[in-house]
């Protein structure tokens, strides 16, 4: 069966294909389907909707699957008329579809697949081949000709991650020129060693991979690393797990397997929480190739951390950073600014905390202002009262790029000295709160530019002191 997968156009220009997108393509390839992909969000993808529709007509797939993400779903919906004219079954997947399946059908999709897609998309293709009812597919929501919707059985989480087709087996489907015009022969790759996160943060939906933590065997991870290196020649790979260190015992097995069986000098980065690392663990991970660790901090005010159910304290953060630097690791910290409960005082405490830990931090995240995504308490608790219900369907919210296609790091950080998300004003900040958010953004930008030796710029020259807070 011919199947076309599309990552729709978006202002966010990607420097590498999404891992989830690769996983779905690999799952279909493994069972014998003829698969093509179009990554219209790639940094150097230049074709328009008419070109995409022409590819659909030429390929004549049995269905077209689109990956939907809340921030850019408006662009995906705008693409649908051209795809509909090409004449094919339209299938929605991805994080936004999992939270809002009915909405995707209302906007023109025939089928919405919720949850982890690797198994459900294969089941959908099988149902089409056999002539079975599409509503028999786990996680499927199927629009009928009369407008009604049939819903399949619930899609459970994939427990045996080793059984999934390795994403690198689909990398040949992605044109390297979409990501790098220099002519490199392979696309960049990353690795997932686990899925799920046990945290309960109010800003995170965690709807696809869930809160239960599942992990791959060490042998499976090592096999993928060796295959990626053989294909690309790269020795550095980012590990994209939401909570890499959530199960410490499995990491000792992984480190041993890496040291024993990886056939090159591996270097990797990881993302985790400050309360689930230890000095011994960081030392062990460094020995296996860890060079960079990113901690989700979110706020420097312990009361805000309690309200957002982060489960981490500022003391945890300081301690984890000290341990990481003692091992010579590069460090990064993510902060979120402007939660509904934030005040000028809580944000000033966050700024002071950033200043306190700055000597231990190589870089702060360039993103900052809180965005309420559907499926999160941050959205559900506030959208009706503050008037941003289904904000993602408004074109005005759909043109700010979280990651602009900027190759120059200096320009990149200048872009984020004033996060455009602040102008969306989801939580109706008063002037003092808005001013403090800008001060926090400014500090992060200055810190990052200073680390790169690029602070000489009039944008970052000292300004008048902040007005005293009441």
Listing of model-derived features with the role each one plays in the protein:
Residues 1-224, 231:
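Acidic, low-complexity intrinsically disordered segments
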Residues 2-8, 29-37, 53-56, 145, ...:
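Radical SAM enzyme core and accessory elements
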Residues 3, 90, 137-138, 237, ...:
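Hydrophobic/aromatic residues located in beta-strands of well-ordered beta-sheets
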Residues 12, 101, 199, 249, ...:
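Flexible glycine/acidic-rich beta-alpha junction loops that bind and position SAM and/or redox cofactors
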Residues 16, 168-332, 339, 352:
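Radical SAM [4Fe-4S] cluster-binding motif and immediate context
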Residues 62, 110, 234-237, 291, ...:
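Short acidic/polar active-site loop segments enriched in Thr and Asp
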Residues 102-106, 281, 341-356:
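Catalytic cores of alpha/beta
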